């Protein structure tokens, strides 16, 4: 029985099945997710006899930090190795990336939800990997727990988590939500929903499904284009879920009184960064309610795109504000340590394939 990734209810039921009191499941749940204790022998709230039995019948499988890359901006990028295992058939071994980003008042952890990705966004390094496999709930939660434990002596009061690493979270919906229920449970990892953000390329059925979850992370949309023609080229998923459908789903998505839907827009020099693009984005945002736009200048890598000029960034930002669209310019952390999602896994995999750029 693999314990990491199991809910409190699952642990309680399993312990009852072993003939133990259900509250032993609560103790294991607390040890895993609040105390970050991954050694059954050190779970001293459990009787010694039970610990010995669990040592024979249970496992706690953690990703292996194959590499750590330390950026001059203080962020740490992890390349985690995931072992093969059994879950509805054989799971392939894989590598995924997570980033720990400290700031003055908080730390933000960016995590992956799939190894590789099938969505095939043309500007994304992860697309070159293809989809290797979905991550389990335990593998997703571990990307939060391990950096928190490693940096426990210097943690700030607030932890933010963004599901913006490798993979499309809404194409691994059940495992992602199983992980999020643990992360957002006050008796689990204990993060507030307002501090956790799920980013999607625009999987409309997944957005509609997420909207029905009683406790859920905030929603972010990876927009990156100002019209369907442009988005079809940059993000082929748009051919299946065009902007009209995507924005309609966003309009219906429930948000709290202080909650925004975030639209992320990667600025690609000479591709989607013109003043007319900015005006079109402002029109797309009209009537959607509480939204904000994060402008993300392209992070240089091996793909055939270039950074936007500072003038283009400033003009795009200015036009959005002029049109009453809340907008922020966000520069990638860890740019000096292969910070684009997928770069580390690709480097480990070997030579990179060529990708057709948008001309």
What are these regions (language model features)?
Residues 1-96, 251-259, 265-359:
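Auxiliary Fe-S-binding modules of radical SAM enzymes
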Residues 102-146:
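Canonical Radical SAM [4Fe-4S] cluster-binding loop centered on the CxxxCxxC motif
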Residues 70, 83-85, 101-103, 152, ...:
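Short polar/acidic secondary-structure junctions
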Residues 100-101, 175:
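Residue-level structural signal for beta-strand termini and adjacent loop
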Residues 70-71, 112-113, 199, 222:
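Short linear Ser/Thr-Pro motifs
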Residues 148-328:
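Conserved AdoMet/S-adenosylmethionine-binding subsite of the radical SAM
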Residues 76, 96, 107-111, 119, ...:
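Generic beta-strand structural signal
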């Amino acid at each position: 029985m693999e314990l990491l990734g199991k809910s409190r209810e699952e642990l309680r039921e399993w312990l009852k099945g072993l003939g133990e009191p259900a509250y032993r499941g609560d103790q294991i749940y607390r040890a895993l997710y609040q105390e970050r204790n991954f050694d059954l022998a050190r779970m001293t709230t459990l009787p010694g006899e039970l610990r010995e039995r669990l040592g024979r019948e249970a496992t706690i499988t953690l990703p292996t930090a194959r590499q750590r890359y330390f950026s001059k901006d203080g962020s740490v990028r992890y390349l985690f190795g995931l072992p093969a295992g059994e879950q509805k058939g054989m799971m392939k071994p894989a590598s995924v990336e997570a980033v720990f980003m400290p700031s003055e008042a908080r730390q933000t952890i960016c995590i992956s939800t799939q190894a590789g990705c099938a969505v095939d966004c043309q500007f994304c390094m992860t697309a070159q990997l293809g989809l290797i496999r979905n991550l389990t709930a335990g593998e997703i939660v571990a990307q939060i727990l391990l950096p928190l434990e490693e940096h426990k002596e210097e943690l700030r009061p607030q932890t933010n988590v963004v599901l913006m690493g490798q993979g499309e979270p809404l194409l691994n919906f059940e495992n992602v939500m199983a992980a999020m229920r643990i992360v957002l449970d006050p008796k689990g990892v204990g993060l507030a929903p307002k501090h956790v953000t799920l980013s999607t390329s625009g999987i409309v059925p997944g957005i509609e499904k997420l909207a029905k979850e009683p406790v859920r992370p905030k929603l972010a949309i990876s927009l990156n284009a100002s019209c369907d023609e442009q988005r079809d080229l940059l993000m082929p998923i748009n051919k299946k879920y065009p902007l009209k459908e995507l924005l309609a789903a966003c309009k219906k998505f429930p948000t709290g009184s202080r909650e925004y839907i975030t639209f992320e827009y990667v600025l690609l020099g000479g591709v989607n960064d013109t003043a007319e693009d900015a005006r079109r984005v402002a029109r797309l945002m009209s009537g959607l309610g509480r939204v904000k736009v994060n402008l993300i200048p392209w992070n240089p890598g091996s793909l055939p795109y270039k950074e936007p000029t500072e003038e283009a960034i400033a003009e795009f930002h200015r036009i959005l504000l002029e049109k009453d669209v809340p907008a922020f310019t966000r520069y990638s952390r860890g740019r000096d340590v292969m910070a684009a999602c997928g770069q580390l896994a690709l480097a480990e995999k070997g030579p990179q394939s060529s990708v057709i750029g948008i001309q």
